[in-house]
Amino acid sequence: MKFSLVDDVDRMFDSQAKAWPLLARGLQGLRESQTRVERAFGRDVLVRHIPHRIKSTTAAVDVASIAQRKCFLCPANLDPVEEGIPFDSEFTAYCNPFPILDRHLTIIHADHRPQRISGQFGAFLKLAQALPDSFIIYNGPECGASAPDHLHFQSCSRAVFPIGHDILHDGYIPRVFKLEGGNPDELVHRMEQL
């Protein structure tokens, strides 16, 4: 049985934008961002300048810096007004207060554990099914994740950023893997092989 989070996510964003000043400022920053399309290597590339993202994109993620800070994804350290939507018994989806696109979520594992995808493809796939109008991101610990010490995924609306479009063209060397199929167990098995 498919389970959709779409309506719950929309309600959460509406509610949290009113109750949580940090998210309200982040959404305002997103509305004020500058976006244009540039042509590069025969492809259209979406370029977006989002000044409010500087805190996240410049976060210190070295071992010493991480050891000196509280994990901002652990439930005990979340903003008291921050609310989430439980997902699949081990995760909770929260509004990302530093959004890059519409409906930007951070989906956080209940336990403080390292950012590792191994063994998590089933949850990743369930998220993709529950958020069909979004794309799901796993950002590795050495690939830009600002919280390499706590397992999490992110999701954003596909509306502005059709991530799957260019990977379908011949001659394009993908930095994204796109797997499709009707058998979830087979998809999880294939993902574990990557």
Please give the residue ranges for each predicted region.
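Active-site microenvironments that recognize anionic phosphate/pyrophosphate groups
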Residues: M1-F124, S134-S146, R158-L179, P184-L194
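Histidine-centered nuclease catalytic patch
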Residues: D149
